[in-house]
Amino acid sequence: SSDTQETSSPSMDISKASNFERFVFNLLGRDGAQIRALFHDQLNAHGSFDLSASEAFKSAAETYGFQSGKSTHADRLATIQSIYAQFNDIIDTHTADGVKVAREHMQPGVPMIVLETALPIKFAETIEEALGRLPPRPARFEGIEALPKRVRLMPADVAQIKSYIVQNLH
């Protein structure tokens, strides 16, 4: 979308988050036609869609306790710094967003769990800005940029994708 702005937490920059789309897909009974209507038709035409009338969404909201919040670049840097100072652990920018918002929703006596979402090395520039040094690179990623890249564009056809995977498994 033309309204999407680049930030130091790029998964938050996308207008159509695939993980959210996947969640809604599963929530609504894995109905591809309904997902297309929501994410392609309604979102493109109106910039949003509303699930509040859906019984499945009402149930999920109650079950999962949806909450939201925001995190700016400055918040992200401060959270990375505070986690490092407190735990001597480097977290990535997405996890920092989650920690920042989770801290706002904490309740006394109620545990809060935030799952790490990426490796800090993926966001080395922001980690360096926050901590004054680059995060360590896991050994398994040394030289990854020099490895060959393989890309195959295919139509959005489940049968063709499955066939390609089966034929190209090594």
What is each stretch, according to the model?
Residues 1-170:
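PLP-dependent amino-acid enzyme catalytic core
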